[in-house]
């Protein structure tokens, strides 16, 4: 028996498809999302509808984004869902979520069992729309959730941690074993809730500068800041900003990275 076939659909590796089929896990996720009629709910990657169907029981209307044309076609003819769904057959990485929120007249509630092969770039795409998003609930590879929630001075703390926590409060919800899926992935999974900050705790004047600094620091995470960011900051500037030049990327807090970004924005000549 081919374990990549579920409900008559062959799971496509190129789309990173693993279908959730554990009812306890499904109920736990839907309870965590707690969708309500009238809310602007958007599901990314509904697949065979494991989450779509129970969410649909609570909603009059909601939107799903599905790249796989075969799965989108199945949803279009689904007996209980077809009249409730607005189906966008498109890559979520190309979606303008601000436009969706504007059409809905309210911030979006986004959820999904995200394909693990695109989860990190999709997160960065969504972070750019947090002003249009009320909250997000995602099933992700457990290692990615660990990175999202990690604090400074831990190996899991990285660029994703800094950028996620800059935009959102990050809350782990539950862990999910491989056997909850078909086909079973080779890794553990977890559900995370991301709630965009009403006010950014440590605002930066140019997010691109924060992105550049974190990229350069974490691309050379074993080096001290004196070396990894030496082209941008002298040891004296780091000291002036309250940051030890002998520390490494993982030892610097979100607030300190924002401090670095704002200093660099005020001294544009240093960016050249």
Curated annotation (Swiss-Prot):
Gene3D superfamilies: Ribosomal RNA adenine dimethylase-like, domain 2, Vaccinia Virus protein VP39. InterPro entries: KsgA/Erm, rRNA_Ade_diMease-like_C, rRNA_Ade_Mease_Trfase_CS, rRNA_Ade_methylase_Trfase_N, rRNA_adenine_dimethylase, SAM-dependent_MTases_sf. This is Ribosomal RNA small subunit methyltransferase A. It holds the Pfam family RrnaAD. Belongs to the class I-like SAM-binding methyltransferase superfamily. rRNA adenine N(6)-methyltransferase family. RsmA subfamily. PROSITE patterns: RRNA_A_DIMETH, SAM_RNA_A_N6_MT. Signal peptide: none annotated. It comes from Pectobacterium carotovorum subsp. carotovorum (strain PC1). Keywords: Cytoplasm, Methyltransferase, RNA-binding, rRNA processing, S-adenosyl-L-methionine, Transferase. It is found in: Cytoplasm. Its main location: cytoplasm. CDD domains: AdoMet_MTases. One of its GO terms (molecular function) is 16S rRNA (adenine(1518)-N(6)/adenine(1519)-N(6))-dimethyltransferase activity. It catalyses: adenosine(1518)/adenosine(1519) in 16S rRNA + 4 S-adenosyl-L-methionine = N(6)-dimethyladenosine(1518)/N(6)-dimethyladenosine(1519) in 16S rRNA + 4 S-adenosyl-L-homocysteine + 4 H(+). Its EC number is 2.1.1.182. S-adenosyl-L-methionine binds at residues 18, 20, 45, 66, 91, 113. It comes from the Bacteria. Specifically dimethylates two adjacent adenosines (A1518 and A1519) in the loop of a conserved hairpin near the 3'-end of 16S rRNA in the 30S particle. May play a critical role in biogenesis of 30S subunits. One of its GO terms (cellular component) is cytosol.
